[in-house]
């Protein structure tokens, strides 16, 4: 079995593949203070619930935007799986030209998503990943990664509002019944939700005009399903895009 791990700033997503099939996947909180042993305890319990033991894991591939957590995961793999993981970063074979001024600056998750999306759809794409930050990445019809945009995530935007406007109550980020709200809670929700929908549509439309292209727009990430249905620009939602990208990169790099 192949263990794939995507370490994000807020959450870490873990997947277990049997061949090409994603058999299990879990989402846990990313904690920079956790040691490799602590992550191993969490993973052991998740595997136990699935009826899987560490000795069934044949290989591991990891993408991470959190260096301390990457070190902990690498320690976990060496100690409990018995091998060092493949790590998405400089030197890994992506099969995708990175047309960025400095390719080393591109987040591992952005490249993984781009690889997975192009492998599946084989056409020009914009990949929108709703995470701690929301990223917009353009891949042309030749499968070349051009770059994109990074915006504050929806939850970061909400937290900033609540932190700076002390009289406003903290509310759940959700789709409100109306844009013209009749109470403070719904007013906040309307501003956050529809404001973010407008941000997504606005950036995608500008990318289309700038590239003079009509790419397929694919959304992924924790909040993709919340936002995508209300936008006018997102065509597909693929919640496991990053995990699938890790599987593809593993196949391109294994000995």
Swiss-Prot record:
Transmembrane segments: none annotated. Signal peptide: none annotated. InterPro entries: ATPase_NBD, Type_III_PanK. Its cofactor is NH4(+); K(+). Pathway: Cofactor biosynthesis; coenzyme A biosynthesis; CoA from (R)-pantothenate: step 1/5. The active site is at residue 109. GO terms for cellular component: cytoplasm. K(+) binds at residue 129. Keywords: ATP-binding, Coenzyme A biosynthesis, Cytoplasm, Kinase, Metal-binding, Nucleotide-binding, Potassium, Transferase. Its EC number is 2.7.1.33. CDD domains: ASKHA_NBD_PanK-III. One of its GO terms (biological process) is coenzyme A biosynthetic process. Substrate binds at residues 100, 107-110, 184. Catalyzes the phosphorylation of pantothenate (Pan), the first step in CoA biosynthesis. This is Type III pantothenate kinase. It comes from Syntrophotalea carbinolica (strain DSM 2380 / NBRC 103641 / GraBd1). The gene is coaX.
